[in-house]
Design a protein with these regions (language model features):
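Active-site neighborhoods and metal-handling regions in enzymes and metal-associated proteins
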Residues: 1-338
Length: 338
């Protein structure tokens, strides 16, 4: 994604914040799996949305109207030894020249620099409760400058929920965001097709799941969440992720899988017969679900309430289950009692 996209987002946010304010947002950190092995790093979504910076141990600071630059990025310094072991770091120079920061400082110096940036502002925009350790540090910085307020130092008087503004912004997608969402969806569609093509009785759920691993990695995408590949009764477990059982002839296979491209995810769930042929009962239920899907999609349009697609699907499913005698009663009453 182009730097202009991130700059536009930051500018829009700072306009909403107003004067004499400061926004402070921490990146995600690496999480240890065992001994010297970390889990794959996944950047904080809000941090990525505003910066595009995909390293751990970083802090974004926005100060509307700051003379020396409104966007400050604290990040790790270049370190040849650490980079030999763990990969390249941007460092302060690249943070400015490549990633678009106006100013960049070493993350290890944040305790010395950030209190001075807080001074003179009325409000601090932050997301409290996400990273407790960072919350404590931020409160410590505020308390530090409060102790010096008697000497005329102006101290911020309130914390404001940054996510209140930010998540409203994220609801509205730009053309570039839509492009990435469509790309993630297209990759996921191909993965589902691969799974359907190789599926047969006698294989194991994990063999089907491997098709998603292959297709995603071939297009530089990651899993958006653990894939659910459940044959037979396993498909009734809402968050089944064991994916270890054999696939049996005559049963259905449910797959709920999605990939992520540059932070934008796809999410597709499909159910189909393991042997390629629906039984009469399977076909009847499948047709109801398909009709519910189509009814929901028709309700996805500007002006409708966000719950309209759900309500349309519920009505079709309830009516269909009554017709199959799997539910008894009046459709409207059953929906009301849901």
């Amino acid at each position: 994604m182009k730097l202009t996209e991130f700059k536009r987002r930051r500018s829009q946010l700072m306009k909403m914040m107003g004067k004499n304010t400061i926004a402070i947002l921490s990146s995600a950190s690496e999480v240890t799996r065992n001994r010297d092995v970390d889990y794959p790093f996944r950047q904080d979504s809000d941090f990525l949305y505003l910066t595009g910076f995909n390293e751990p141990d970083a802090v974004m600071v926005l100060i509307p109207g700051r003379k020396h630059g409104e966007y400050i990025l604290f990040c790790r310094e270049k370190d040849p030894e650490q980079e030999t072991w763990h990969g390249r770091r941007a460092g302060q120079e690249a943070a400015v020249e490549i990633h678009g920061a106006d100013d960049s400082f070493p993350i290890d110096d944040i305790d010395d620099i950030l209190p001075g940036l807080l001074e003179g502002n009325d409000s601090i925009y932050n997301i409290m409760g996400r990273y407790s350790e960072f919350d404590h540090r931020l409160i410590g910085w505020v308390n530090h400058i409060k102790k010096q307020s008697r000497s005329g130092m102006h101290v911020p008087s309130e914390f404001v929920a940054l996510d209140y503004l930010l998540h409203d912004m994220r609801l509205y997608k730009s053309r570039e965001e839509l492009r990435l969402m469509r790309k993630a969806a297209a990759i996921n569609v191909r993965a589902h097709h691969r799974a359907m093509e190789i599926c047969e009785a006698g294989k194991y759920e994990y063999q089907i799941a491997a098709e998603f691993d292959h297709e995603y990695r071939c297009h530089n995408a990651e899993h958006a969440y653990p894939a659910i590949v459940g044959g037979g009764a396993n498909g009734c477990i809402l968050h089944y992720t064991d994916n270890t059982d054999p696939l049996n002839d005559g049963e259905l296979l449910l797959i709920d899988a999605g990939c992520e491209v540059e932070g934008y995810a796809s999410d597709i769930t499909r159910t189909f017969p393991i042997n390629g042929k629906y039984s009469k009962a399977q076909r009847e239920v499948y047709d109801i679900v398909l009709a519910a899907h189509d009814a929901a999609v028709k309700k996805v349009k500007p002006g409708n309430h966000w719950n309209d697609p759900h309500n349309a699907a519920v009505r079709v499913i309830t009516k269909g289950l009554v017709e199959l005698k799997l539910l008894k009663g009046n459709v409207n009453t059953l929906i009301k009692e849901q």
